[in-house]
């Protein structure tokens, strides 16, 4: 049985966010680095640094905790395409999350990107996760 690194990232970030931890440590792979770069660019995490421990690399991400008048705002991450059920979409049918407020992360032939970038380039791909 293989590992689902994308689900591991999402679960680690979600658990750290719910537990109000400041940082989360994720094993570094090409996919995880690209997803974390997107989260950093979109403002869901504050910063990222690469850390080496016993010849293994990890990404240490600082989470962004936003406060509203009703309490702490939680970032919701949801895995869509998984190893047992892959979900693909062309660029015209990529869903808009909360009317465009949230983002969809896709794996395309040109790399991992957000739904907005994929629509601009007019390419579809595998829908990895939703974030809002």
Curated annotation (Swiss-Prot):
Subcellular location(s): the record lists: Plastid, Chloroplast
Q: Which GO terms describe its cellular component?
A: chloroplast; ribonucleoprotein complex; ribosome
Give yes or no: UniProt keyword rRNA processing.
no
Task: List this protein's GO terms for biological process.
Answer: translation
- Subunit arrangement? Part of the 30S ribosomal subunit.
Which NCBIfam families does the annotation name? PRK00136.1 (NF001109)
- The name under which this protein is listed is Small ribosomal subunit protein uS8c
UniProt gene name: rps8
């Amino acid at each position: 049985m293989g590992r689902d690194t994308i689900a591991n990232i999402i679960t680690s970030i979600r658990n750290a966010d719910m537990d109000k931890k400041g940082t989360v440590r994720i094993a570094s792979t090409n996919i995880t680095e690209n997803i974390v770069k997107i989260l950093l660019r979109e403002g869901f995490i504050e910063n990222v640094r690469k850390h080496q421990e016993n010849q293994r690399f990890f990404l240490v991400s600082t989470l962004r905790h936003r406060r509203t008048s009703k309490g702490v705002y939680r970032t919701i991450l949801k895995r869509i395409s998984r190893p047992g059920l892959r979900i693909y979409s062309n660029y015209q049918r990529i869903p808009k999350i909360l009317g465009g407020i949230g983002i969809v992360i896709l794996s395309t032939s040109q790399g991992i990107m957000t739904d907005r970038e994929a629509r601009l380039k007019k390419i579809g791909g595998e829908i990895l996760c939703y974030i809002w």
